[in-house]
């Protein structure tokens, strides 16, 4: 098996750090880069999701032969960015709880930021070889699967993230026909995001979720469009 390079965006969160460990522990992975807003001992770059200039700077550094990692061409790019509670405000349960500031922040973090990551990091995928770009979505981002209501901003932002991925994937697949593009539902995972809503014993360990998501991703075939699946590899309706 040939060696490969992997990039994790949002590598400081529970799921992002588990993805990074997964790649670091794979002997076939010659380079595992984790980017986040937090400084760490093993990364030379950091970005701010809501600052496009910093995203562009990181992407440029990764495709620069004189950069900290040399010229990178990634087989795997995982976007693990996102948040449910933003600025100490949790999801809205009722229509009367909506306010423009909170809605805009949800879209900024869970849709606009991820879209700009696609813009700047899609070009770093391998060109004429099998590759994968996956972004963390959520089952609540499915319009068809919405039977419970609530969580207005988070649902809407994740649905927007899905649409942005689908549209970008169709364009990107014209140059990268062997690439898989996926919106991933990681399940309910032990993390700061889920801690207020579910007991730890009822949630997946991050490493277990990542192991299953990687298994699901390896079984997806290029279709020229994005695919929406859960951690078990089951298709989720858009």
PLM segments and residue spans:
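Rossmann-fold cofactor-recognition segment
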Residues: 37-57
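A short helix-coil junction within the Rossmann-fold of NAD(P)-dependent oxidoreductases
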Residues: 68-70, 120-129, 175
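Hydrophobic structural elements of the Rossmann-like NAD(P)H-binding subdomain
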Residues: 78, 134, 181-184, 194
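Catalytic loop of short-chain dehydrogenase/reductase
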Residues: 83-87, 91-107, 127-175
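N-terminal Rossmann NAD(P)H-binding glycine-rich loop of SDR-like oxidoreductase domains
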Residues: 9-25
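Conserved active-site helix of classical SDR/Rossmann-fold NAD(P)-dependent CH-OH oxidoreductases
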Residues: 115, 159-170, 207-214
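C-terminal helical subdomain
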Residues: 179, 183, 191, 198-238
């Amino acid at each position: 098996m040939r060696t490969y390079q992997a990039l994790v965006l949002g590598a400081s969160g529970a799921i992002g750090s588990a993805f990074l460990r997964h790649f670091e522990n794979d002997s076939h992975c010659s380079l595992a880069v984790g980017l986040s807003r937090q400084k760490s001992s093993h990364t030379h770059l950091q970005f701010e999701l809501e600052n496009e200039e910093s995203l562009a700077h990181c992407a440029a550094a990764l495709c620069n032969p004189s950069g900290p990692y040399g010229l990178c061409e990634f087989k795997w790019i995982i976007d693990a960015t996102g948040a449910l509670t933003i600025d100490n405000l949790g999801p809205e349960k009722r229509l009367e709880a909506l306010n423009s500031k909170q809605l805009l922040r949800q879209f900024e973090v869970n849709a606009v930021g991820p879209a700009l990551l696609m813009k700047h990091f899609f070009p770093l995928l391998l060109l004429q070889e099998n590759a994968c770009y996956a972004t963390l979505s959520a089952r609540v981002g499915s319009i068809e699967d919405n039977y419970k209501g609530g969580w207005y901003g988070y649902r809407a932002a994740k649905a927007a993230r899905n649409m942005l991925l689908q549209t970008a994937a169709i364009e990107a697949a014209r140059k990268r026909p062997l690439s898989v593009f996926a919106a991933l539902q990681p399940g309910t995972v032990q993390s700061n995001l889920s801690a207020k809503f579910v007991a730890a014993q009822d949630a997946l360990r991050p490493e277990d979720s990542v192991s299953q998501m990687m298994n699901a991703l390896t079984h997806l075939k290029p279709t020229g469009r994005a695919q929406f699946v859960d951690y078990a590899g089951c298709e989720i309706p858009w």
